[in-house]
Curated annotation (Swiss-Prot):
Family affiliation: Belongs to the methyltransferase superfamily. PrmA family.
Record EC number: 2.1.1.-
GO terms, biological process: methylation
One Gene Ontology CC term in the entry: cytoplasm
TM ranges: none
GO terms, molecular function: protein-lysine N-methyltransferase activity
Function in brief: Methylates ribosomal protein L11.
Gene3D superfamilies per record: Vaccinia Virus protein VP39
Protein name per UniProt: Ribosomal protein L11 methyltransferase
Top-level class of the enzyme under EC nomenclature: transferase
Record carries keyword NAD: no
Chemical reaction(s) catalysed: L-lysyl-[protein] + 3 S-adenosyl-L-methionine = N(6),N(6),N(6)-trimethyl-L-lysyl-[protein] + 3 S-adenosyl-L-homocysteine + 3 H(+)
Protein location: Cytoplasm
Length: 316
């Protein structure tokens, strides 16, 4: 089979949104080459095991390559891709330079093209994300290994917003909690939460493709075999009392989620949010505070912010 590689040059902040657009246009998989990821993966960070000198990568911005089968007439979908990427400015994301190129590939090229960019990566003190096809053994006591298939979009755990959420989860999980993952994408946060000892996990995403991607990754991790994953619009129609709610989604979507999170969170519980770019941080923080939460932690990685908010008990 012949394949077509479509590559979009964009900004670091627009990476995951662009990847999602490419998947929705019919891609069978994506490859993300983000300069910011490599800046955050210096050899001395968390004992990183990647030798950057051996990996070809961009030094600024990002390139997302998507792979389309011959059943997709790519010249017809490229204008739509360009238009949708340009419209990301409506969500506070700058997708520039938004340059699109197209290359014909053989089946063999497609099968291996993106794998050279994906290696075991230590993303927190205790978590290492490993591609599904690689053999890997923990190198330190207490290390938790998560396996992901990066052939789908929705993140591989190395994006700054995902790291912020993972680091936050390490600070609030004690074991046995009930957690809700809103906008689960790849399912990486749900898998990590189970590995850290959470009891029950509900994972939701509006996109059916994301739900399928998450289920694929859940199946790769026996610890997450009982995670409930389903399509849903944020927490609309959900009526539960969770100990932790985590959302790695854009700020514009976090804002309407806040009252839903407040309704579905136990007193004494935590709301973790990331996906918040610099110029949206203050409005998100204000919205969370006005809903009755206390901000207990604010973290930042590059232009991205993470928030941990606590819902006080009557005794607090």
């Amino acid at each position: 089979m012949k394949w077509t590689e479509v590559t979009v040059s964009t900004s670091n902040e627009a990476v995951e949104a662009v990847a999602n657009i490419l998947m929705e246009a019919g891609a069978s998989g994506v490859k993300i080459d983000d300069a910011l990821d490599y800046q955050n993966l210096k050899p001395d960070r968390y004992g990183e095991i990647i030798d950057l000198a051996t990996i070809p990568h961009v030094t600024s911005g990002a390139k997302i390559s998507a792979y389309y089968p011959e059943t997709v007439f790519v010249p017809e979908v490229i204008p739509t891709i360009k238009q949708r990427v340009s419209q990301l400015t409506d969500f506070g994301l700058n997708p520039a330079p938004n340059e699109v190129s197209m290359t014909a590939l053989s089946d063999e090229d497609w099968a291996t093209a993106w794998k050279k960019y994906y290696h075991p990566v230590r993303v927190t003190r205790y978590l290492t994300i490993v591609p599904s096809w690689e053999q890997y053994q923990p190198v330190q006591s207490g290390e938790l290994v998560l396996r992901l298939d990066p052939g789908q979009a929705f993140g591989t755990g190395t994006h700054p917003t995902t790291k912020l959420c993972l680091q936050a989860l390490e600070t609030v999980i004690n074991g046995g909690e009930h957690l809700i993952d809103v906008g689960t994408g790849s399912g990486v946060l749900s898998i990590a939460a189970k590995a850290m000892g959470v009891g029950a996990v509900e994972a939701y995403d509006l996109d059916d493709v994301a739900v399928a991607s998450a289920q694929t990754n859940l199946d790769l991790n026996p610890v997450a075999k009982d995670v409930h994953v389903a399509a849903n619009d944020l927490l609309a129609g959900i009526d539960t009392q969770a100990d932790i709610i985590v959302a790695n989604i854009l700020a514009e979507i976090i804002i309407p989620l806040v009252p839903q999170a407040r309704q579905n969170l136990k007193r004494g519980g935590y709301f973790i949010a990331s996906g918040i770019i610099d110029d949206k941080f203050q409005v998100v923080m204000t919205t969370i505070k006005e809903a009755g939460f206390q901000i207990t932690q604010h973290t930042q990685m590059g232009d991205w912010h993470g928030i941990v908010a606590y819902l006080p008990t009557a005794e607090d």
